[in-house]
Amino acid sequence: MRTYRVIVGKRPVAALAGIVALVTGAVVGLAAPAVADDDGETHRIFATREGLVGKHTANGHKITKRDHFVALPSRRALSAEGSGAFSVRVCRADSTRCEYAPVWDVGPWNTTDDYWSATRHAARDLPKGTPQASAAYRLGHNGGRDLFDRKVTNPAGIDLADGTFRQGLGLRHNAWIDVTYLWQGSARTGIVVTDGRTLNVRTGPSASHARAGLAANTARVPLLCHDRGQMITGSRGTTNLWYKIGAGNWVSDAYLNTGTGAAVAPSC
């Protein structure tokens, strides 16, 4: 088991609370180590269910009970309604289910905390990957208060719409999840195009493979590599081209807008 000490500059971040923060593979501390890949960095973040059915998101979308989107606490990563320019992959901590979803709202807690950025707008004394609310709740950052001076009652750094929370990840309670900020990656991307419903993500390049999760309509997904598999007819035509979009995650090109019907990623 590897142990990580979270450092800002030359001082342990946890000195803010008079302790040294340790992060291990078994215990979630201040921030899990980032995993850099062609699809962006991944951080372990505490997620809460957004709810708020009938209300409007920061981009003007009216929330429904089976919506598939996420909220992040900064407008710097807010997609326009109907767009997935900023999208994330959210996975259960045990990696058994993932969803690819657009960022359509701002929150929880803060609105200027782009904690995934190396040049974060707020709480610059915290390391990349650590939400200010998480540091406030767990380590007493800013006196245990958010950037609006409210007492922080949970360490959330992402909100999940009800459909993402329940159908996408199969969660029953707020939980720690792995979040990949897909716009940070260097891989080619494709836009999920459906009639509004979610697209099944499979464990391999055919519909007979087990379902590994969901991809929301408009989500922008990384195209890590391709293979030829089952012929599928979808919103973009008929093809046997499939893309790997994450570890054990595959979708058919029949539901992707990539700008061409040819493969745009290397062979797997």
Whereabouts are the PLM-identified features?
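SH3/SH3-like (including bacterial SH3b) beta-barrel domains
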Residues: G204-R220
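Secretory targeting and sorting signals
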Residues: M1-A36
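Short, low-complexity, Pro/Ser/Thr/Gly-rich segments in the mature regions of secreted, periplasmic
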Residues: T260-C268
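Residues that act as N-cap/strand-start positions at coil-to-secondary-structure junctions
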Residues: G82-G84, A207-H209, G237-T239
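Secreted/periplasmic proteins
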Residues: A34-T203, R228
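Well-ordered beta-strand positions in beta-sheet-rich domains
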Residues: C98-P102, W176, L214, R220, ...
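Small disulfide-bonded, cysteine-rich extracellular recognition modules and tandem repeats
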Residues: Y4, T24, V106, G204, ...
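SH3/SH3-like beta-barrel superfamily modules
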Residues: A216-T260
